[in-house]
Amino acid sequence: MEITLITVGKTATGYISTGIDEYCKRLKRYVPFSIKTLPDIKNTRKMSEEQQKTAEGNLILSELTSADHVVLLDERGDMLTSRGFSVFLQKGMASGKKRMVFVVGGPYGFSPEVYSRANSLLSFSRMTFSHEMIRLFFTEQVYRAMTILKGEPYHHD
């Protein structure tokens, strides 16, 4: 199973990009993993929040196939431990789905259409983090989950 992270807007902070690149490099030995960065919406000052969410939602939906298992990284989602997340990924891999797609939305969240397409919602914390930080946290947690599943000594309970 391939794991894809879809994000809106590029990661501009150098140290975050470096961390993401490091975990992507580490993940290559475990699972096909990719990050698809969608362009920021232009002229957002002229748009309402709803218009911006709709425009971003259309971009996100255009990247998905009907066969994808879609997980939104959303503050209202289920919270899992690192071990729980590894079980979540293991179940996804065992399901026979070709691709599990995790999505980080734009600054205002997701459009109703994206929520409707989602198979599940996952939250990293009750706190709010920058979208860039979530990208780093996510790639690290996927790496951690893979080491847990392989019984490797990266994770400590």
Regions found by a protein language model. Give the residues of each.
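N-terminal beta1-alpha1 ligand-phosphate binding loop
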Residues: M1-L27
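Loop/turn-to-beta-strand initiation segments
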Residues: E2, K97-F102
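Conserved RecA-like P-loop NTPase ATPase core
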Residues: L5, V71, G105, F138
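Short hydrophobic segments within beta-strands
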Residues: I6-V8, K36-L38, V103
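Short glycine-rich anion-binding loops that position phosphate/pyrophosphate groups of nucleotides
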Residues: T11, E75-D78, G106-G109
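Conserved strand-to-helix beginnings and helix N-cap segments that scaffold or border functional pockets
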Residues: S17-I20, S82-S86, Y115, R135
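S-adenosyl-L-methionine/SAH cofactor-binding core of RNA-modifying enzymes
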Residues: P32-S34, P39-K98
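Structured adenosyl-cofactor binding patch, chiefly the S-adenosyl-L-methionine
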Residues: P112-H156
